[in-house]
Amino acid sequence: MSFTQPPVSPQHNSNSQHSRSPLRDVNSLDAKQMRKRAWWLIALNFLIPGSAQMIAGSRKIGRVAFIATLLLWALFVVAGLLALVARGWLLSIFGTAFLAEPIAFFLWFFGGLTIFLAINLLRMLNLNRLVPGQRLLPLIALVATCSVAATTLIWSGNTVSAGFSFVSTVFKQQGTIEPSNGRYNIMLLGGDSGSDRFGLRPDSISVLSISATTGAAVNIGIPRNMQNIHFVAGSPMRKVYPKGFDHYCGGDCMINAIYKATTDNYANLYPDAKAHGSTPGLEATRDAVEWVTGLKIQNYALINMKAFASLIDAIGGIDVNVKKALPIGGQQDCVPANNAHLSDCPDALGWIEVGKQHMDGHLALWYARSRHNTNDYDRMRRQRQVEDLVLKKIDPITLLTKFGAIAKAGAALVKTDIPAGAVGTYVDLAFQAKKLGIKKLELVSSSYPRLSANNPDFRYARVLINRALKKNA
């Protein structure tokens, strides 16, 4: 007769294993072991959310949290790979609702889940079993790790949401853009900041030409007072001005007056402008700029100069080396004694003094746009200087830490017809251009005497442009 041990049920066997686990069976642990257990669980909860519950708590909660953790890791790995090899695709996510919105909600959900897991873990730790003097430090560690994880995740969700809001608000057009002769050419206009004058009289006009392959960029500055302007072949404005832009402003027909002339009198010539995210004034200005430069302009970006000040505030201001004292406000040219005496210029509201200064958006805008005691060419130089300083200030760290404020300012800053599908391509090229450095070509008489504002040699201007583009292909 043989005797055998009775079979052990799976449930009994599982319970036996649980009882042998020091992380789960707290009744058999002393205060020292409980302290060690607490630190292990806090570390696991931070590094692998859900693992602490799977080992020492509710396996159901642990499994849900662990699956969410794997999804989060997969999301970060994919984002990291795209950032390295296909940054344009990564940036395109911001313009895709069915991708950006679920990602933002998932990050917010995981941030909330992190807080829930920390509260659940606090109950599991049984800190009352520790020596009284050893209870506070694990509690602080749990709160700190939870705060770091939850804050990071919620901030990440906010960043994705802000990015989508910015892209969907600014880049409303659909489709993509093809390069022209291997380059993307974007017309940049700086509009007056008054609500009743926005865009009606561009303060600054330039063309940013970017190589589609290398990102090498040239910023071509066009003086706002350039005259004898014609329109590119095929432009409806040629019917009105067959011999060039004249008969509107009494012999002083500057290029920046085209916007208002078209808006007020010839808007019917561009019936499809609004449907394509533009305006008749912008389209007429584009036709003129294409004639001046000889370049095909794929897109425009109209900058609201008042909102530009908000962008400067969002990045924490800029540091400017002021070469000449400039008045804030005022309508009279005057020479201040010692660079800053209001008594010499009674209508000025204040002075921007010579020397290195840290400027907020309001002061930087006045520095870039002040008209008095200066000329248009110096004004163009100051505008480019401010633009360069802003671009240099928006480094990856600033972009990440202040993305929400930058995106909010940017949404009010730009009106453009760049389609959402081209945002990734343009931003990717912008990073390359910033790395290479943006070359400048100012079509002004101070640099090229043949380009006088009232009678410029446009053939010569196009030679200069082609030469600059070949050097930066």
For the regions a language model picked out, list residue spans one by one.
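Terminal targeting segments of Actinobacterial cell-envelope proteins
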Residues: 1-52, 92, 116, 128
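Hydrophobic, aromatic-rich membrane-embedded alpha-helical segments
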Residues: 33-68, 72-73, 111
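Membrane-water interface of alpha-helical transmembrane segments
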Residues: 35, 59-66, 93-107, 135-138
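Cytoplasmic membrane-interface segments at the C-terminal ends of transmembrane helices
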Residues: 53-60, 114-136
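Membrane-embedded alpha-helical segments of integral membrane proteins
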Residues: 71-126
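Alpha-helical transmembrane segments
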Residues: 74, 109-119, 147-154, 424, ...
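Internal/C-terminal transmembrane anchor helices
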Residues: 131-162
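Non-catalytic, solvent-exposed segments at the cell envelope interface
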Residues: 155-473
